[in-house]
Amino acid sequence: FRGWYGWGEQGNVLEAGGPRYLLATMLGVTAGRGNTVAEIVQALTSAASADGRRPRGTIYFLTNGDVRTRARSGPVKGTVKAIEAAGVKAEILEGILPQGRRDVAGLVTGTPDFDWPASGSRLVPGAICDNLTSFGGVFTPNAGQTPLSAFIRAGAAGACGTVVEPYVMLPNTGANSPAAFQPKFPHPALQLHYVRGACLAEAFYQAVRSPHQLLVVGDPLCQPWAVIPAVEIVNAADSQPVEPGATLAGKIELEPRASLPEGGVADRYELYVDGVRVAQCGLGERLPLDTTALADGHHDLRVVAITATDIETQGRRIVPITISNHGHTLALTVEPRRVRPADTVRVSLAGAGVESAIIYGMGRVLGRTATGQATIELPAELLGRGPVTLRATGRTGPNPADAVNAPPVTITVGE
């Protein structure tokens, strides 16, 4: 999935036209019976650590007498065979949860209530847990049924649940009566899409026909079984890798390179400067970059390699660089580096060829100066909590090349 792809009725990518799909999840829910911020951060950190690691574990499919497992039991055996054919262990168990299994790489079950700690099982990083029940996505107190947040608390990379009773009205002897509707829940092939290398969001939305009542929570980009390209950025002028801290000037060409195991190939490359795509090329081609049109000073250079597969797995390398064309410099100093929310931070600028400057962080302007030499004080409570990165840009005119970026400084706000 990419934001600009159009799709046909049979799931084929169209040259033009067709609906576009922008995949999304909730990173976490803190309201009601949701998770604490610490639990959400821990789960997201664990999920990010799983990317491309091909975890050694087993995906478990639970079956029991409950209609919640019978509703989608038909395709389970075929899904298990396909997962095993992809080189990942899968197993069908009787019960509600796997008991005493320390290698749970994924879970499909169906039950109104469960107690994960009592199972004695352990989730490996990157696991998707899916429980078919009516109110898994309802977090209000006393709603009944165990919410999906129990899986996030246990370390799942993602889970889902419906936010209302997922009934559909079906004809029944001449009268409409409610019945559970399996297409409102993920098909068991959710886990198959995942082990074939799709990211979490791609796996979920390929597996659900009617997701309008379904809340998906977790890391949308987690991709434990993806084969991720290792990327190198080479300066064509001297055939040397562009290393962190490198200084670049003038018009240059970059040679993107990617290596993959098992004979894989990356056939497309994209170049980003500070998160903005500025060039793209094919296999064996170069990425042009006119650094004279950019601000002097600090920039993040990113090259993304895209594999020649249906999933189009991406790998990337991000390199902080310095651009030096116009003689402008700017340094940013922040003290102290660790501060309590009730305290103040001192932010100092020292620039050459700078007429004014802006200090910003967390997407907000925090201060402005009329010169390139200045010190301002900021209440730490304005910066949020945890690691906070501050940046500064100086200017001598209206054009991008009339600016200079200071190297960013990261501080920690907390008790």
At which residue positions do the language-model features occur?
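Cysteine-dependent hydrolase recognition
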Residues: 1-251, 309
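Short, compositionally biased P/S/T/A/G/V-rich stretches that sit at domain boundaries
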Residues: 217-249, 255-262, 320-343, 412-415
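Short proline/glycine-enriched turn/loop motifs at strand-loop junctions of beta-rich domains
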Residues: 262-266, 350-355
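Short beta-strand elements bearing conserved aromatic residues within extracellular beta-rich modules
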Residues: 269-271, 357-359
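Short beta-strand segments within Ig-like beta-sandwich modules, predominantly Fibronectin type-III
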Residues: 277-284, 366-372
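Surface-exposed, short loops/turns at beta-strand junctions within beta-sandwich domains
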Residues: 291-297, 380-387
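Hydrophobic/tyrosine-rich beta-strand signature of extracellular beta-sandwich/beta-rich modules
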Residues: 299, 303, 390-392
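Short, solvent-exposed loop/turn segments at the edges of extracellular beta-sandwich modules
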Residues: 306-312, 395-402
